[in-house]
Amino acid sequence: MKKIFIILISLLIANSAFALETPMKKLSKYFKNGELIKILSYTSAKWPNGYMSIKDGSYKNNPIEVDAFIAFPKKGEGPFPVVMFAHASGGAALFTDEWFKFNRLAAKSLLKKGIGVMFLDNFSARGQRHTYKDQSTISHWSTVMDAFKALEYLSKDPKVNIKKVGITGWSRGGAISLMASEKRLRDALISKDLYFAAAQPRSPPCWSIGMFVNPQPIKENKTWMVLGGADIFTLAKDCVKLGEKYKANGADIEVTVKKGWHHGFTANYEAEYEGDNATFNECPGAFTNDEGIIIYEGNSAYPDCIKWGAKIGGNKGGVFKKPFLKFFTENLL
């Protein structure tokens, strides 16, 4: 056991050599009683072997400590429900960005209702600020591992009602929030009695990142996925189809498509074209089969199928906040 511990510490030191300082320090400006914490997680193998490294346990060869910021309600002693916020490809800096206020405003409202909040930084510990120009720099499997390991961390905190933990995010964070309901991942990574009670993904990439072609949902999870009907960054139709597979396999899932809404619709600016984001809608669809192998749909070829630019924004945060809060209060309180 001592030898294993020494090896783990050595690997953590080696993997932290390129770590960046988390931008979430700035969250203390908005949440005075919050604190930065470190969570032991892991980095998966690179594409296309990300899930296979989880399935066979080899992910354990790459431990890493990721950053998180947690805040509890000022009133009461708990245990409290908690909502976890997962960021998009723009990284954890979006949590304090002046043009992306929705998450922290929603978090403040949740705290007032008696629900704790946690913000998760998937990128800084892995030496990246963002991934929107090159999504391959950090795998989606690594980031969903972070979410499950954060759930495991919360299970050891007496201030947390571990049966009432939710998760939310948009784009990459939406993918994490949707995949957080996957039984195969939970069972491989943490105790089988842990689960996210509620998940609210927005505009996840359902076509190109290796989502399970035959999802196995955790029965205790309730998911509300919200999509932009005008989103050309992550197409709504692909997530509607995936949502139908979840429901057919027993998931408690509702999918809502908002007509005319674009990618990142909760950003507090009107939708505008941004040209430095890669889109993969014309690329072959990539999915993970029951054996853990990536399979493809379509005949187009990389890298010619990759396009650049899409409209992002929409200033819909004010409209969306009320049903967002209702979803979590109904399912966590």
Model feature map: region roles:
Residues 4-13:
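Sec-dependent N-terminal signal peptides
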Residues 78-89:
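Short beta-strand element of the alpha/beta-hydrolase
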Residues 191-260:
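The feature captures the conserved acid-bearing segment of alpha/beta-hydrolase catalytic domains
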